[in-house]
Amino acid sequence: MRLLEAAATHPAGAPAKQLAREAGLALPTAYHLLRTLNHEGYLRREKGVFVLGAATERLSAGAAEQNRRGMVADTLAHWCDLIGVPVYFAIYRDGEIDVVSVADTVGNPAVEEWADFRETGHAHAIGQCLLAQLDDEARRNHLDRHPVRSLTPNTVRDDRTLLRRLDALGRMSPVVEQQEYALGTVCAAIPVTVGTTAATMAISVPSSQAYRLKPATRLLQEETGKLLRTLAFSISI
């Protein structure tokens, strides 16, 4: 890594001896590492000097992804503390529901994923909010792969009923779900659309505290509006 850091300071390239000196490595060790880095594509030798190779882009992309995930996690943790409820962030990617990050506390635990979120989008607020943002063909395709099934006595019973509900919601309307995924839990989700990517922020509370859901959702909408740019970064995660 020290050799790569040294090479990065020389856009026009630097010879092996200079890189070894700047990295604080013995020349034989540096030669061995430089050959390896050149073979792996992290460095490229041109006219006697070493320059950064194409593979270093993967390193920077990985670091950028890690930073984005950290920003999302920090944002959700802040909202969890501020609102006093678990907070979820999910996107619809490659035809599947992807819960990117969840923030909760001991006093406000997240919903237990007792049935795979990806397969039960018809039953929870996250899935319903994401499906509402899709066009009719994409919704039907999703339901063909993940059919509606009962999880609780409150779960929607069939595709037709669900599709009517989604049509009535509209793409950018909040979704409230009352014990359809898990008994004892009520949830709300708000849509966050960036470009063509469907995304959602969601919260959950015990059904005994259902009165908290509406004010908590309103506060989440306000906070999401303030930090929409932060959420936009996470779409590429």
Which residue stretches match the model-derived regions?
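Extended hydrophobic
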Residues: 158-226
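A structural signal for short hydrophobic beta-strand segments in well-ordered beta-sheet cores
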Residues: 42-45, 89-90, 192
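Amphipathic alpha-helical effector-binding/dimerization core
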Residues: 51-145
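Intrinsically disordered, low-complexity polar/acidic regions
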Residues: 151-152, 183
